[in-house]
Amino acid sequence: MSSDTSPAVVTTPPPPSMPHKERYFDRINESDPEYLRERNMSPDLRQDFNMMEQRKRVTQILQSPAFREDLECLIQEQMKKGHNPSGLLALQQIADYIVTSSFSGFSSPSLSLGMVTPINDLPGADTSSYVKGEKLTRCKLASLYRLADLFGWAHLANTYISVRISKEQDHIIIIPRGLSFSEATASTLVKVNIIGEVVDQGSTDLKIDHTGFSPHAAIYSTRPDVKCVIHIHTLATAAVSSMKCGILPISQESLILGDVAYYDYQGSLDEEEERIELQKVLGPSCKVLVLRNHGMVALGETLEEAFHYIFNVQMACEIQVQAVAGAGGVDNLLVLDLQKYKAFTHGVAMSGGGGVNMASHQKWKVGEIEFEGLMRTLDNLGYRTGYAYRHPLVREKPRHKSDVEIPATVTAFSFEDDSAPLSPLKFMAQRQQREKTRWLNSPNTYMKVNVPEESRNGETSPRTKITWMKAEDSSKVSSGTPIKIEDPNQFVPLNTNPTEVLEKRNKIREQNRYDLKTAGPQSQLLAGIVVDKPPSTMQFDDDDQGPPAPPNPFSHLLEGELEEYTKTIERKQQGLDDAEQGSLSDDAASVSQIQSQTQSPQSVPERLEENHELFSKSFTSMDAPVMIMNGKDEMHDVEDELAQRVSRLTTSTTIENIEITIKSPERTEEVLSPDGSPSKSPSKKKKKFRTPSFLKKNKKKEKVEA
């Protein structure tokens, strides 16, 4: 085909009505130095600049008066409609933040429902001079001021609540003059002494009202048992204080108050006569004081008890005012007998917890259970009271009998120092280890069971998996420790110095670290008992405390004769002189005669010398029998033969006839005669001769010379 016949490409120009679209590069001047700087900038830095620009625009919008007015109008319209969704609460908090930032910290009441000043502001203040007890008391007192404000008891003049925090130094904390009850916090309270001098100013520059503080100081000085004083004069209490009848026992609240004291208050208690009169009126146990034509005062050993009485005083006064107005006078009211119903009302209220203690293991003080409920209410509203609750609100989940109360064995965790901070990662690792140890130390018995797996479609799979199930055999299940440890110092004796307890604990921990083995703790019950040791069996070894040895029959011999006798003994031990056994009978007879004379209890002093001479001569002439009598255990055969032959011999003396039988294996107790020589009782048996001490000494000398 030729080129002329090929189809040509036809281009259609754009219609003239379409406008020209501006591109990005048409708006940018490439020679602009600002554009060149941004183009050469790194991407991360360019992104940071963009975020800063966006935040600047958001800040400008939030700080603009127009946005604040629009937001307030929106919230007002939503509140008029009655709806209160979560989004509205979020907008309300934003509005509170903006309004408080714009108006120097003063917020609008209609917009401050979601934002309140926290009561416990001590973490942000300088609290180095406060001890732990004072911090808790400050939080309690500030919470009590907030409750008085919420109940409508606040008054601009002479209405105060005070607490004594130190009985030794008479330090009292009270709210300063000019600070409303709704602004009371733990750090704004002022600490003064009993005469009104400031000890700790707190976080404000305001001063206390000495006129309003004078009744508190007078009560504290007259009643050392009082810790808290609450003084109010609401409409109901002021009205009842002006009645001649006073508080009438016409309601349960009035019966709970018990004895009520009345005092003609003149506006101040600075004079000594007035304080003496107040002391007479109060008495030792009165908890409610009526100031005539002024108001009411409640006393308490704790803050909770004082609040308990002031709350019932307010309720009793309101009931009385309404009853008098409705009945047309006091004469038309039914007045109860206070003494008759005191045991059912005041006695139960004074027992603590409104009678809850009668069937509960938790012992509550007067007004404490009600005060904790109000503190939980304030905490739920966001007041952050800082109150230390005694018991949790939510009851613990009931556990099965097989659950472990305490691990069966002691865990092997490493002890951490109390002062050193614990990292979160380390805490999580220890938590996992504790769970594992709790599982391993469980006293429950488990069985390994193969359970078939289930497939996705619901059918049973041929494969099985291992599952641990609790053993049904109750005999194999061991019980845990029945004692529940609620306090780490549960087994520490009472009235013990805490420093000594910590030192003892650290010492025990050190012993556990180094694995020291000791005999264990010493019993305090058996520490002072002296145990008598049983008498030991008779021993024939030479000792210093034993009975005195018999007189030495060889004391008159010379050294040469002793050496010759020693050599003779050695030859006999070596078996060199066996042919001389024929003279056994004669020598044995002489030995038996000597024994009868030395062991007889009727031996006389005149014959002692003859016996000793005969005894010494027999030992000098004695060969084999002497060796057997003074020998050791290796000569048992010869000794038995001697015993058999000597037993046939009898010796007749001038005093009495004694038949001697020598039994070598037996040992008898020695009985000494008055002269120190051993004697024999007729009821006791013979014993063999001991080895003389001088022979042992000679053997030792020979060994040393060798």
UniProtKB/Swiss-Prot annotation:
Keyword flag Membrane: yes
Signal peptide range: none
Site entry (Cleavage by asparagine endopeptidase (AEP)), positions: N357
Region (Disordered): 1-23, 471-495, 534-556, 574-610, 651-706
Keyword flag Membrane: yes
Outcome recorded upon mutating N457A: No effect on cleavage by asparagine endopeptidase (AEP)
Pfam families (alphabetical): Aldolase_II
Cell compartments where the protein resides: Cytoplasm, Cytoskeleton; Cell membrane; Cytoplasm
Modified residues (N-acetylserine): S2
Expression tissues: Cleavage fragment 1-357 is expressed in the brain and the expression increases with age (at protein level). The fragment is expressed in the cortex, hippocampal CA1 region and hippocampal dentate gyrus in tau P301S transgenic mice, a mouse model for Alzheimer disease (AD) (at protein level). The fragment is only weakly expressed in non-transgenic mouse brain sections (at protein level).
Subunit structure: Heterodimer of an alpha and a gamma subunit.
Domain commentary: Comprised of three regions: a N-terminal protease-resistant globular head region, a short connecting subdomain, and a protease-sensitive tail region.
Protein name according to UniProt: Gamma-adducin
Organism: Mus musculus
